């Protein structure tokens, strides 16, 4: 019988084992993710007989619309995966639902994610991610500060805040620092998604009071696929 729970630091070893099987075995990447970024996120796991079989993680994010004085707290969902030997049991879907329900009970306004491939559009729609936004890649360049060879989290965040009054940004700048070190960032604007079956999109699960129109023309910056 699967059991679902908020992950503890002790669970990271089991989550990492899933990542190594499903995503990457690159040690420098995994070291930054699990030592610097994951402790600042919330992860949820499914266990069977004490073994972690499926996991999902969420980064704390904030939606800001400076022109309208609107600010909403939410999460970016990533790292959804199940050990291959447990495929077919719908454990990932159950873990996603558990994690989303926990965050919604805590009062979060939205959770967004990006299907790794378009064939998963319907999968996430069935899990309540029904507000679809088309991604438009954005060429966003920041000049490093004088004397620096790379962008710092502060310079990137300052540039985003200066140029995009409507945006999603990290609640903890240390997450951004880690992602920059990994060179793991993509930049996008988003518009309404008219044909979600055909378009690559961001999917959002929100509480009932929030419409997808709120997120139209929002600037997104998040980890690369």
Language model features by range: what are they?
Residues 16-35, 166-178:
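Conserved GNAT-fold acetyl-CoA-binding loop/helix
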Residues 45, 51-61, 74-81, 112, ...:
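Conserved beta-strand in the GNAT
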Residues 63, 112-114, 130-147:
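Conserved catalytic-core motifs of GNAT/GCN5-like acyltransferases
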Residues 77-87, 225:
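A short, internal acetyl-CoA/4′-phosphopantetheine-binding micro-motif in the GNAT/acyltransferase core
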Residues 96, 103-116:
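Conserved GNAT acetyl-CoA-binding A-motif
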Residues 123-129:
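Conserved active-site tyrosine of GNAT-family acetyltransferases
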């Amino acid at each position: 019988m699967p059991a679902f729970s908020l992950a503890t630091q002790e669970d990271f070893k089991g989550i990492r084992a899933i990542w190594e099987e499903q995503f990457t075995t690159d040690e420098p990447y995994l070291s930054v993710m699990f030592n610097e970024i994951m402790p600042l996120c919330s992860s949820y796991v499914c266990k069977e007989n004490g073994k972690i079989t499926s996991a999902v993680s969420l980064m704390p994010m904030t939606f800001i619309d400076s022109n309208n004085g609107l600010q909403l707290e939410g999460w970016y969902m990533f790292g959804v995966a199940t050990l291959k030997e447990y495929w077919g049991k719908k454990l990932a879907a159950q873990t996603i639902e558990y994690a989303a329900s926990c965050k919604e009970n805590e009062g979060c306004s939205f959770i967004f994610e990006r299907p790794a491939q378009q064939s998963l559009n319907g999968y996430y729609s069935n899990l309540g991610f029904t507000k679809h936004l088309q991604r438009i890649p954005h060429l966003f360049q920041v000049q490093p500060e004088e004397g620096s060879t790379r962008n710092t989290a502060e310079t990137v965040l300052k540039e985003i805040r200066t140029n995009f009054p409507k945006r999603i940004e990290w609640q903890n700048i240390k997450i951004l620092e880690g992602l920059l070190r990994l060179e793991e960032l993509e930049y996008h604007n988003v518009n309404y998604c008219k044909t979600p079956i055909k378009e690559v999109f961001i999917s959002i699960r929100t509480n009932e009071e929030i419409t997808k129109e709120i997120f139209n023309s929002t600037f997104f910056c998040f980890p690369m696929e």
